[in-house]
Amino acid sequence: MRTAMSCGGGLAQRLDFSSSDEEDGMSPGLEEGSHSNQRGSPVNSWRANNCPFPITPQRNERGLSPSQEELSPCSDYSPVPSDKGVGGECPGTPLHYSTWKKLKLCDTPYTPKSLLYKTLPSPGSRVQCRGQRLLRFVAGTGAELDDPALVNVNPFTPESYRQANFHPNGKRKERPEDDCSAEPQMKYAEKEHPAVFQSKRFVLRETNMVSRYKTEFLEIEKIGAGEFGSVFKCVKRLDGCFYAIKRSKKPLAGSTDEQLALREVYAHAVLGHHPHVVRYYSAWAEDDHMIIQNEYCNGGSLQDLIMENKKEGRFVPEQELKEILLQVSMGLKYIHSSGLVHMDIKPSNIFICRKQTEVGQDESDGEDDLSSASVLYKIGDLGHVTSILNPQVEEGDSRFLANEILQEDYRQLPKADIFALGLTITLAAGAGPLPCNEDSWHHIRKGNLPHIPQPLTPAFLALLKLLVHPDPVMRPPAVSLAKNSLLRRCVGKAAQLQKQLNVEKFKTAMLERELKAAKLAHGSGKDECSDLPPMSDFSCRGRKRLVGAKNARSLSFTCGGY
């Protein structure tokens, strides 16, 4: 496509609009228009002084409009309107800007370079990207990230919490946003989400190429291993605190263990923080492996304590057994009150935290404040947790399994945790290993405890037998165990005696202070009397008569010789 521009009736310049030569043709033109000083050619002089190539909106790097760029101080071009109109312009008059735009002398047809400039963001954009591919990727996935169907819903969330955050008809609440148009505000308003109350299958996928585990944590040692995975003692690089990081042994994406891993995360998130439940901090996926960041318990597990006592030939004393039973019962009380059951209570899932108390630190103010004790027992490993109202039971260790669970009778699910707790305390008392099956297994399910080598009080032994009663209805709930007077008698006894001692010391100090003040007052009175001159008999008699309130008025008439 070729055209010509007439100047004074002659051919001034031939313009070539071929797509292949456009970029090469424009660059020399720019160089020629800005650096050429040829005076022999009137065309070159006109191009250099009056007709610079305008910058298109796609190539405008400074955010200026085409009109601002053309009228900038750097350019000598100033279009002068002609009285003759567009068609009657003088041969030497430069083209008007509107006429120049109609000719479309720049970026038409588009070349690969000009199309590339069109994909770049405008200079006024607030978000700066590192590259064009990242920008296009983010823009393409933004709608997918806003889709609520891709968000997991915790199946253990209480119904009251759901009703408080969602309309009864299942619609999301509208949350107005500032500085936004009305259309984004109604993004989720009045929009049905039928699957928002249903638990969806979450696929474990890693979104970042950099390992968060290696970046944020320094692995110290391996402290445990189980069927699900391994547990490592790690220190976080940011805060310098120790954490227990649990990592699955094998990839879980698409496997049957995937729901078990998610169930533990769901339970930890719903339960929150309790002094007798291992604290949960975070969870994420790396290379299809589930990683859970939990509280680090420096005392190990109850199973470790049992094995250590067995090697040394020692037993956990009865007072300590009662404290373990009480604290674990309080943890189960909290779990059961949340509508959940643990379903895998055993010594290896009860962890010990030993607090470093300073010398002279005040003891507990009461027996109910168990969180201030020097040793805390906490329930962990929530991989088998299920809901009481909607049970999806995954059987735990068969050695601690109640008979009704084996018969698939889920009407008294919390009592299964009580049965397992009774056997756990029995093992801590020194009983031998529990059977996995056969007649000895059924013998225990009939309400018989294994042999305990150390002597226990009849009351405590009867309580342990009640925990493993064959009828789940007869087993005491966790609420009753937490208030049991047999367990409460030993807990906080030292603190109670210390409190009474402090009260008696305070009373003694107050009495000593009053006695000292009385002695000082008595001594000062004697000194004042010794300094005074001797009194007459009349004054002494008068002072004596004033002592009695009833006698003062009657005896006053006898004084003075009246």
Curated annotation (Swiss-Prot):
> Which Pfam families does the entry link to?
Pkinase (PF00069)
Q: Which organism is it from?
A: Xenopus tropicalis
Residues the record lists as binding ATP: 223-231, 246
Task: Recite the UniProt keywords alphabetically.
Answer: ATP-binding, Coiled coil, Kinase, Magnesium, Meiosis, Metal-binding, Nucleotide-binding, Nucleus, Transferase, Tyrosine-protein kinase
Q: What is this protein called?
A: Wee1-like protein kinase 2
Q: What is its EC number?
A: 2.7.10.2
Q: What does the record list as GO biological process? A: meiotic cell cycle; mitotic cell cycle
Q: What function does this protein fulfil?
A: Oocyte-specific protein tyrosine kinase that phosphorylates and inhibits cdk1 and acts as a regulator of meiosis. Required to maintain meiotic arrest in oocytes by phosphorylating cdk1 at 'Tyr-15', leading to inhibit cdk1 activity and prevent meiotic reentry.
Top-level enzyme category:
transferase
Q: Where is this region: Disordered?
A: 1-86, 161-181
Q: Which residues bind Mg(2+)?
A: 349, 381
Which spans of this chain does the record mark as coiled coil? 494-520
Please give the GO cellular component terms listed in this UniProt entry: nucleus
Give the top-rank taxon of the lineage listed in the UniProt record for this protein: Eukaryota
Identify the catalytic residues: 344
